[in-house]
């Protein structure tokens, strides 16, 4: 009988930015790569599962009910040889398991999370990582955090970096109307620090550079609009909300630079997406961003609008060098490699 590997794909269709991108791109690359395995994805949105992966629908209104009752019941029925989860194991699951942990921001700086989320993540993620057969992390930083903050044995942790989708390249449509813009990619929330981006734009003075935000509003949209109004920048700050893959690729191509002011990141996919698109990157020295940038970006201190404004000026002035360095860096990451290394983890447990 063909071994069954079940992948929890609950992030699909939920606009969970980096987590959804990880699951979607991993499934796309896994499809067709392992004819010796039966790969199945459990999700609320089976229509988003790519061909080559078996889609198993699991409607759920509440995450707690899903993880404590519905998913355990389904897994008892399916009896997979390996099950792959994001962040946490479902209640009572004891079969061979893989957990991907994207970051430990809830331990590194919990002030960016609500009290409820802080309690949930601190209760479930470290415990799940210690119980899992293998833990996949996307950066060396998260590996160090799991060892030091969660007590996970190093020999059970496998670093498998994220990749860059082929749609991110200089070739293709651009989003521009002749007015230059810096692009900010990510949800509007405190940890991503969109307000520092607006403050940095204000410090650049009365030029024509705009700031375009692409990502869902997770609570800071109103504050961003208020900051723009306070500085008289209403016509130079645009909030696009969640955008499609194709629109995001076009936004990268048309941008003068990527601005990534985050206070903490376990990886930082937009850095590589911008680099692959031929766009200079200005990012903070926060979390894993220096590790992922690999010397191919302008790095500034988080929460410092003065440094951010200076970084933008340097990126625009040194565009040619940064674009060339970015291409070299982005070529070191691919979702195909992510899938192959993930399959190797599955096969260790069969």
Identify the role of each PLM range:
Residues 1-350:
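Carbohydrate transferase catalytic cores enriched for Leloir-type hexosyltransferases
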